[in-house]
Curated annotation (Swiss-Prot):
It is an enzyme of class 3 (hydrolase). The keyword Transferase does not apply. Its EC number is 3.5.1.9. A motif (HGGXW) lies at residues 95-99. The gene is AFMID. The main chain amide nitrogen atoms of the second glycine and its adjacent residue in the HGGXW motif define the oxyanion hole, and stabilize the oxyanion that forms during the nucleophilic attack by the catalytic serine during substrate cleavage. It comes from Homo sapiens (Human). InterPro entries: AB_hydrolase_3, AB_hydrolase_fold, GDXG_lipolytic_enzyme, KFase_ver/fungi-typ. Pfam families: Abhydrolase_3. The lineage of its organism: Eukaryota, Metazoa, Chordata, Craniata, Vertebrata. GO terms for molecular function: arylformamidase activity. Belongs to the kynurenine formamidase family. This is Kynurenine formamidase.
Length: 303
């Protein structure tokens, strides 16, 4: 399953020994894109997301801007298959953007291929920095998952997928205390795509200007530091950790070490390095039904 020959497999230099410039470089995904310049890669990603969302809203049965809480921006977009039923698998997506950019309104990449196969897709908005704190984002995402379970109690499984910062937020749901939400979500799978799971390095990069994370904040919100001790809600719930070949060495290290930590616990974890894709293509390609990751997601849901 794993091929370690990719250009970005973990650096032999521990991040704490890197220069400030190198650490910044490692945690700037657009600098590792080989097919386009950094700025163009970001523009292309946004454009593909906007086009996919516009198409999904125009052609799929949907409920848009549904509030899952009372806070500003606490909304989800729900896209349904043609067959009307509440007994569906639900796929929740949390966008990336280093917890400070991105939007549900440009993140419906996977709606067409998944709804075509009978999966409801929920694109989740959360309050990004600098207005929103990371603790609050984690709370929002937790409430969005509880909301879907309460609204669709006859679901055939809830699957959480996050990209980059969104993968971190999805991973935090492995640690969630559902008792205070009055519901235990029917979590059946996690897809953690090019994520960051130990937030300590972020404290020392320019990304922290908006986030304003203290070391304590970073540690409290690092699933890498906590997941080994957590008990799986359901030992059959699958956790897939995915990274792109052209992700940076630090992104590779983060994903590989998180996978290893999951394995040390009782989690049903697997790891995939996807060939010939970068940090952005890995999600852009979810618009395609024959894409490797799209197929992995569908097989996991319908196995």
């Amino acid at each position: 399953m794993m091929d370690v020959s990719g250009v970005g497999f973990p650096s032999k230099v521990p991040w704490k020994k890197m220069s400030a410039e190198e650490l910044e470089n490692q945690y700037c995904p657009s600098r590792w894109v080989v097919r386009l310049g950094a700025e163009e890669a970001l523009r292309t990603y946004s454009q593909i997301g906007i086009e996919a969302t516009t198409r999904a809203r125009a052609t799929r049965k949907s409920l848009l801007h549904v509030p899952y809480g009372d806070g500003e921006g606490e909304k989800v977009d729900i896209y349904f298959p043609d067959e009307s039923s509440e007994a569906l698998p639900f796929f929740l997506f949390f966008h990336g953007g280093y917890w400070q950019s991105g939007s549900k309104d440009e993140s419906a990449f996977m709606v067409h291929p998944l709804t075509a196969q009978g999966v409801a897709v929920v694109i989740v908005a959360y309050g990004i920095a600098p207005k929103g704190t990371l603790d609050h984002m984690v709370d929002q995402v937790t409430r969005s998952v509880a909301f879907v379970q309460k609204r669709y109690p006859s679901n055939k499984g809830i699957y959480l997928c996050g990209h980059s910062a969104g993968a971190h937020l999805a991973a935090m749901m492995l640690l969630a205390d559902w008792t205070k939400h009055g519901v235990t979500p029917n979590l059946r799978g996690f897809f953690l795509v090019s994520g960051v799971f130990d937030l300590e390095p972020i404290v020392y990069t320019s990304q922290n200007v908006a986030l304003q994370l203290t070391l304590e904040d970073a540690q409290r919100n690092s699933p890498q530091l906590k997941v080994a001790q957590a008990q799986p809600v359901d030992p059959t719930c699958r956790v897939l950790v995915v990274v792109g070949q052209f992700d940076s060495p630090e992104f590779h290290r983060q994903s590989w070490e998180f996978y290893q930590t999951l394995c040390q616990g009782e989690w049903k974890a697997s790891f995939e390095e996807l060939h010939d894709v970068d940090h952005f293509e890995i999600v852009e390609n979810l618009t395609q039904k024959d894409n490797v990751l799209t197929q992995i997601i569908l097989k996991t849901i319908f196995q």
